[in-house]
C-alpha cells in the first residue's frame, strides 16, 4: 500500500517522483506511462496550449479509467479550452460517483463555469455527498499502543483479531472486548503493514516495510520490505523472506493454499510467495501503478486488484491479462485500500476518495461490471481515515480513524495534531 498518500492527488505526486528517482529500478510500463502523462499535463498547462492540454487530459482520463481525479482534471482542461458543456458533463459525472471536492473547484480554470446555472445546480448536488451515512457501530476502541493501526484479520478458532501497527511496529492480538496483548514486534524495527491469518495451517503472514523517507525506519533500510511467517499459537517467527529491491510490500491476500499474494503500492508489482520454498514470483505484467489489497476469487485463476490510481482490475493469474472494470461515470473505483470479495459482492475501504468511505459494490457474474453500490460509512466522526477490514460471519469489521491523516510524508505528526483514538467498527454485510 502507498501508505503515506491517502488522497489521490498526493499519490500522483509521490509515484511520479518515485518513477524519476535515480536509484529506482526500471519502471513498469504503467508507471512510466503515468509519469509521462503527468509531465505532459504540467507542460501543456503551463504553456497555455489549451488544445494540447485537453488532448493530454483526455489521454489521462482514459489511462485512469475515468477515475474521479481524472474527471476533475478533464473538467479543468475542457473549461480551459472553452468547452463549458463538456466540462459540466464531467462535473456531473464526478458528483454521480459520490464525490465532493470544494477546494479543487476553487482553481482558476473553473472560473468560466461558476456563473452558469447548471454549475450551481451540480454544485448543490455535490453538497449532498458530504452528508453523514452509517450502517456501522463501534465494537471497541484500540489502546494507545496501537499507533497507526493498519491491517486486521481474525482467527475463528481463538476468536482473536490481529492488528498491525505502523508507528508501533507491532502485531497486536485483540479479543472482541478490545483486550489487547502483544503478539510480535517487527524483527527489523520497520513499520508493520499487511497481515493475514492462515487458520488452517495455524500461521500468520505479515509484512514489514521500511518506507522511503519514513522517519520510523532507518535511512539505510529505506526501500526494503520483508514477508514474515509466524506460528499463530506462540508468535514465534518461522521465516523472514526479503522482498524484491525497492519494493513496498504493503498489502496482502492469501491464495486458497495459503500462499501470500502481496502488492507493492510504490512500484506497481503484485507477487506470490511460495509458502514451502519461500520463492517470490511476479504475477502481473506491469499494468499497475499502485496496487493495493487484492481479493482472491473462488475460481483460483483470477484476483481483483484495486489500483489506488487506475481503479479496479481483474487479473488472470495464468496469462497476466488485465481487464479494468468500468466506472461508467457512476462508480468511484480508485482510492481503494482494502478490498474483500463475497461472491459477487465487494466490500471496499476507500481512503483515496473525497469523502473517504466504506462501501459495498455488487458486481455482475462474471465480474466485468458494477451493478450497484451502497454506503456502509461516510463522513462520520468515527470514520476518519479507514484502512483495512475483515469479514467475520455476517459482519465486516474494519479499522477506522487510523491516524494516517495527521502524519506528514515522513510519518511525523503534523503541527498541532495528535494521534486519534482508533476504533474497530462493525457493519452487517450478509
Language model region names:
Residues 100-126:
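TPR/TPR-like alpha-solenoid helical repeat scaffolds
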Residues 130-172, 420:
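Beta-strand-rich domains and repeat architectures in extracellular enzymes and scaffolds
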Residues 136-143, 179-185, 236-242, 278-285, ...:
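A short beta-strand motif characteristic of beta-propeller blades
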Residues 143-158, 166, 188-212, 243-260, ...:
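Beta-rich, blade/repeat-based domains predominating
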Residues 174-179, 231-236, 274-278, 316-320, ...:
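Short loop/turn segments that connect beta-strands within beta-propeller blades
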Residues 207-223, 401-421:
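Short, conserved, GDST-rich strand-edge loop motifs in beta-rich repeat architectures
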